[in-house]
Amino acid sequence: SAEVCRRDMRGEAITGMRSSLCLLGALLGRCGQVVMEHPGGCVIGVRPIDLHLKALSRMGVRFTEEAGKLKASAESLHGADISLPIPSVGATENIMLAAVMAQGDTRITGAAMEPEVTELAGYLKRCGARIEGAGTDRIVIHGGKTLYGADYRICSDRIVAGTYLFACIGAGGNVFLEDAPSAQMGTPLKVAEQMGGKLCVAEEGIYVQ
């Protein structure tokens, strides 16, 4: 992907998936400019993106509206001290993706601590980034480093595993959740047992009865 630098995102690719918003930080770091539709794909109601915009603005990004699209530009991204009023996973990830390409250090206070943030940090570090504190509410990203490609195996999805877990309990029968991240599923496993499920947590996954 070394040559990828598309500044104008296709509308259908953006409006169909909420997480497309994370392209904002990544492409600003790569291209310096992005034009994109407002993200969609979420059926739980209107979800604002102000946390993302305010955080990136502190890093030197300018935002305007152009024909209903969001236009972002940054002559030079720079590090900043950013305090998130709520621990948004998406905003934390967007800041990290922009910060690894920015000049100087970025400090996030009130960062999200979910496994998804830790996994992103792990991948970026494998690519040469310097990131400290992922998994806590304070993350420091040392920008300006040269990044390179890398192979990285992400952890299995705890939400998908939990969905199958409770589907099994509701429908009955036996299910083996291969590679389920049990270490990230403490509360769902406890609730499943309270509902009458019989669980066996093993290294290779979770057996559900």
Feature roles, as predicted:
Residues 1-209:
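Short, structured segments at the rim of ligand-binding sites
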